[in-house]
Amino acid sequence: MSHMMSACGVICSECPAYLATAKGSAHQQLTVDAWRRIYGLSETAENISCGGCLGPDEDLFHTSGRCLARRCCRRHGFNSCAECPKESCQDLERAQSLWDEVPHIGSTLSPADFEAYARAYCGHRSRLSAARASGRDPRPSVPAKNEEKGGQPTSEHDGLKPAR
């Protein structure tokens, strides 16, 4: 399977929510049970349906629609934050900080649990930096779309073009 990367560098195509959605409701319930045990999350199987962070809103894990880094990428037609000419921003930092503790949690997991429920979230910062440095992004192109009312600027990145 080719890698699909989120705006912030998480590997969507290896994310438990993405994989469980493709495999069906039984796998979604297994994922919910594992997330409850590992991360203390109280999700429902219906809430973890996800088709990838930069996909259509109706195909998202319910929290991804609120991600400002995702919104910015979609608004500017970027495949990920790696294409943005800004070196850093609050939207990206906020998105990436959600995953910073996963490697530490991973050290307490069995190898099977780490592989299934944590690995996709590890290395997100270095993955995004490598994509920026190489000038390539391992995702298919996503059409630009301003999701805010009236198309008004809503981010410090409005007016930016891809760094290429």
What are these regions (language model features)?
Residues M1-L160, R164:
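Cysteine-centered metal-binding/redox modules
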